[in-house]
Amino acid sequence: MQKLWEGRFSEASSALLEEFNASINFDKKLYKDDIEGSIAHSSMLANCGILSKDEVDKIKNGLNQILNEIESGNFEFKISDEDIHMAIEKRLAEIIGKNTAGRLHTARSRNDQVATDFRHFCMRENLAIAELLRTFVKALVEIAEKNIQTLMPGFTHLQHAQPISLAEHLLAYAFMFKRDFERFISSYERNNFSPLGSAALAGTPHMIDRFETAETLGFKAPMSNSMDGVSDRDFALEILFNISVVFTHTSRLCEELILWNSQEFGFITISDAFSTGSSIMPQKKNPDVAELIRGKTGRIYGNLISLLTTMKGLALAYNKDMQEDKECVFDSVKEVHTSVVILREMLKTAKFNEKNMLKACKKGHLTATDLADYLVREKNIPFRKAHFIVGKCVATAESLGLDLSEMSLENLQKIDGEIDENALKCLDLFNSKNSRKSYGGTADESVRVQIEILKKWLKK
């Protein structure tokens, strides 16, 4: 099979080389970006007087025919074509003739063509993933709004710590995913510049208009340095990093859902639609969705490390190593789309078991800090002394087989006479939760403020 670059060569390519060198099996995903880039490039060449109107019309018609062939499944992808860019150019030559098709590549190298296609793909995905995260935040806010007064134990070190609102817990994730959204938007704003026209590395002697192609393709402007345009993949690293952070957050949430779904916790029941069974144990109902997302996180991290390692030792400008930039991005992009959607839908159909959460709040002395704060605030006792007093109260409660909230005033006063009837109010779980009215706290009114913040953001 004739190569578009074979003029300098006297021998045909080895079949081993063709198989090893080809990227068409995965970079064919960029077909639409490549065709859009070529149409924009040909229009610009015509506007600059480099191509005639007739030539451009033939090129555009041919490219649109190729687009239809690919999308209808009638385009034959061949390893011998090496990559999607060469495959499209070769097919274009078959449709409109070699001479006219060959003029499309005027003032363009595969280096800037590839960089443009890939950057265009990543910019589009930055926006698509951001929108996906927005819908996830919306779902979390809706669930939280229904559970402002649902009490559950808050944890540190996976030990019972303080009583909190389930809404507060879910909103913590909502704010994390909000920041994830902002990272993708920030990456889009920072990287939405066009490499097209950088050519191989040093620009081109043809009098082209890079600003025109940048605008046509939705970029803010052309990249200011042609070597930078073809050499770097920081935009790809950023989308991989951003997706890795999303998976850090989804993995943490999934870990909690797995725990909460267990018989030991019983805080949540995942619907049958998002659970699986066992091949041998008839009673099993497994949280496989959450486990898979948690498991996929390692692969997502690996994709980021893979590209970081690929790029770290490359001299400017383009190197073939950079062909390894795409599979990791395509994989991470696919996984973030599927994982966020299924996690969102699983949460929307899950049932939170309020009785079990409340029951759990009556274990672990969740209001101990409230009693210490009361002694500091109302009795002017230094916090370290108050901490010691309440520690004694907890030890006594445990020796009696009670939770601190179940201790009588008589037993508490035996430990320290400063503890009075008003102190008992601090031991009430709901009083404890609603006393934490500081900005961002778990009191009902503070949680409603958080919900309003997110609702206003969602409307923007």
Swiss-Prot record:
Plastid is among the record's keywords: no
Broad class of the protein's primary localization: cytoplasm
UniProt EC number: 4.3.2.1
Keywords: Amino-acid biosynthesis, Arginine biosynthesis, Cytoplasm, Lyase
Keyword Translocase appears in the UniProt entry: no
Gene3D superfamilies: Fumarase/aspartase (C-terminal domain), Fumarase/aspartase (Central domain), Fumarase/aspartase (N-terminal domain)
PROSITE patterns referenced in this protein's UniProt entry, alphabetically: FUMARATE_LYASES
Pathway: Amino-acid biosynthesis; L-arginine biosynthesis; L-arginine from L-ornithine and carbamoyl phosphate: step 3/3
Catalysed reaction equations from the record: 2-(N(omega)-L-arginino)succinate = fumarate + L-arginine
GO CC, alphabetical: cytosol
Recorded GO MF terms: argininosuccinate lyase activity
Cellular compartments annotated: Cytoplasm
Gene Ontology biological-process annotations: arginine biosynthetic process via ornithine; L-arginine biosynthetic process
Pfam families: ASL_C2, Lyase_1
Cross-referenced NCBIfam families: argH (TIGR00838)
Protein family: Belongs to the lyase 1 family. Argininosuccinate lyase subfamily.
The protein's name in its UniProt record: Argininosuccinate lyase
UniProt organism field: Campylobacter hominis (strain ATCC BAA-381 / DSM 21671 / CCUG 45161 / LMG 19568 / NCTC 13146 / CH001A)
